[in-house]
Amino acid sequence: MMRSLFSGVSGMQNHQTRMDVIGNNVANVNTTGFKRGRVNFQDLISQQLSGASRPNEEVGGVNPKEVGLGVMVASIDTVHTQGALQTTGINTDIAIQGNGFFILKDGEKSFYTTAGAFGVDRDGTLVNPANGMRVQGWMAEDIEGQQIINTSDQTEDLIIPIGQKIDAKATTDVAYACNLDKRLPELPEGANQADILRSTWATDFNVYDTFGEQHKLQMVFSRVPGTNNQWLATVNVDPENQAGTETRVGIGTTDGTENTFIVSFDNYGHLASVTDTAGNVTAPAGQVLVQASYNVVGANPDEGGAPTRHTFNINLGEIGTSRNTITQFAERSTTKAYQQDGYAMGYLENFKIDQSGIITGVYSNGASREIGQLALAGFANQGGLEKAGENTYIQSNNSGIANITVSGVMGKGKLIAGTLEMSNVDLTDQFTDMIITQRGFQAGAKTIQTSDTMLETVLNLKR
């Protein structure tokens, strides 16, 4: 039999394999996160008719005579290039821009995918809605009122408890910043309402008690008569009920004696110090904190029958600086509270996912807190992963073990919520490869036809 017959058969068989891969690529042109396949060929073993000989004194060397026996598939690679990103606006749709895989769990089995079309089941678990596999990451822990995500722990299911209640939190810190106008006139004795409006700067801000009830915090600044760079600050919680709340302020104490303090500035307009009515002065450097306290109306009295008081810090900024600090320059007054940490009771209404994969819950009371963080897996040889169907991969002997971290670390890409990575199949390339494959298949068939004709000629010699 002629060797060319078997070579032609191998050509047809292996080009059929290549066509199968191309057909699968084309079929998955719109599959989320799909990575195209690629077939590489190599020749089969060659039959040696004669070996090579070295040159001698009389004649030169002779090359070997070898006849190839066909072609075989060298490899079928998965090409992990980036697919195009498509915006969906759905906050559970997540794309990886760069390297990395999402981690899915089915019981104890781990799967990996770049298809981030996720959803939330009835228990709030973030899942792949097509098969129920659970997305892995790290849940935040509440440690002394702070949400901490420990990414060195084992990964776990991510749960987004929509509708979950968050307890009210009393205000513990109120931060003030911006400017007091040095040109503001001193407040004269016996001042009328017009004089007060011209000579003071008042700012209101909402704070919360332990029940989550909202209170108005009012701070009024006025120039200290006979001084250049001092202001009298008067603090009241619920100013319309001053007798009930009995606001008091002090430095280094949870309960002062009066509701006023003196703010001093240096000759450069920067915050210098604060003095309370007891003569206590803040440190010459660092943050300037004044402790304010008030009666919580409606709370049970303490064991001695005294009203329950709530204390919080008034943060005026850092001495000697201008950033996030009260200053005194010859510009209009703009000082106001810009931040406080209390809130009323609320319910989880929505969530968002940032580029590092941190899931932040947004509550009905305006508060937000971290819920968890998505994990990404990387591999030394991602081409060595085995396809497991349903847009997933599993670890193999040649992929290496999964290196699990957050996004943006150790070569992993960033996450983009509201976006999906599409298939990386390029139809132009696939149709071109299809034509080449078809011609290769036809060439193999032609080899068989020609060999058959030659054999027929040999058989006809007998006639």
UniProtKB/Swiss-Prot annotation:
Leader sequence segment: none
Show the Gene3D superfamilies listed in the entry: Flagellar hook protein FlgE
Q: Pfam families, from UniProt?
A: Flg_bb_rod, Flg_bbr_C, FlgE_D2, LlgE_F_G_D1
Recorded hits in InterPro entries, A to Z, give: Falgellar_hook_FlgE_sf, Flag_bb_rod_N, Flagellar_basal_body_rod_CS, Flagellar_FlgE/F/G, Flg_bb/hook_C_dom, FlgE/F/G-like, FlgE_D2, LlgE_F_G-like_D1
Question: Which UniProt keywords are given for this protein, alphabetically ordered?
Answer: Bacterial flagellum
Localisation per UniProt entry = Bacterial flagellum basal body
Q: Which GO terms describe its cellular component?
A: bacterial-type flagellum basal body; bacterial-type flagellum hook; cytosol
Please give a single GO biological process term from the UniProt record: bacterial-type flagellum-dependent swarming motility
Tree of life domain: Bacteria
PANTHER family reported in the protein's UniProt record: FLAGELLAR HOOK PROTEIN FLGE, FLAGELLAR PROTEIN
* NCBIfam families linked: FlgEFG_subfam, PRK05682.1-5
Regarding protein family, the annotation reads: Belongs to the flagella basal body rod proteins family.
Instruction: Give the protein's recorded name.
Output: Flagellar hook protein FlgE
Species this protein is from? Treponema phagedenis
